[in-house]
């Protein structure tokens, strides 16, 4: 199963009104192919989607362990899967030269650069994710 398919399967556990519109909107973005960061977790094609899945799995595990039946699975999945929507359409890819194992050899590799286009007045990463959820 691809990362995108895993994400869609997990999102099927969300029953809130608007989830179908949210999933349709994600299809029009780079969410499934974007990185999660430029150098740290998920700094690769598809890293944003993969990171969101990992966060969802961990949150469900933690909730089951520390707060069983205290939060709805619906709420936990919503928070975890969509916590980084602010990163949609914020990365560009350009080549970067990296030293090869062979002395004097360099290899071009993709490098992600963070270039947010519009924060719509949001002052934080979290508030922009919330804005994007409300705007769909």
For each of these PLM feature ranges, what is it?
Residues 1-34:
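Non-catalytic interface/linker regions that flank or bridge core catalytic/transmembrane domains
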Residues 3, 18, 44, 71-74:
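Residue-level recognition of alpha-helical structural elements
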Residues 10-13, 46, 67, 120:
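Short N-terminal micro-motifs specific to bacterial/archaeal maturation
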Residues 20-21, 29, 37, 65, ...:
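Generic structural signal for short, flexible, solvent-exposed coil/loop and linker residues
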Residues 28-51, 112-116:
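Active-site flanking loop/helix segments enriched in acidic
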Residues 50, 62-136:
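Divalent metal-dependent catalytic cores for phosphoryl transfer on phosphate-bearing substrates
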Residues 55:
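Divalent metal-coordination and catalytic microenvironments
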């Amino acid at each position: 199963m691809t990362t995108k398919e895993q994400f869609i399967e997990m999102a099927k556990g969300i029953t809130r009104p608007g989830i179908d519109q949210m999933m349709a909107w994600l299809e029009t973005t780079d969410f499934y192919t974007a990185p999660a960061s430029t150098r740290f977790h998920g700094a690769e094609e598809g890293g944003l989607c993969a990171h969101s899945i990992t966060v969802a799995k961990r949150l469900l595990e933690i909730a089951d362990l520390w707060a069983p039946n205290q939060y709805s699975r619906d709420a936990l999945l919503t928070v975890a899967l969509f916590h980084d929507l602010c990163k949609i359409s914020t990365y560009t890819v350009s080549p970067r030269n990296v030293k090869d194992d062979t002395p004097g050899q360099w290899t071009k590799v993709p490098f992600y650069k963070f270039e947010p286009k519009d924060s719509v007045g949001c002052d934080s990463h979290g508030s922009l994710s919330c804005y994007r959820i409300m705007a769909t």
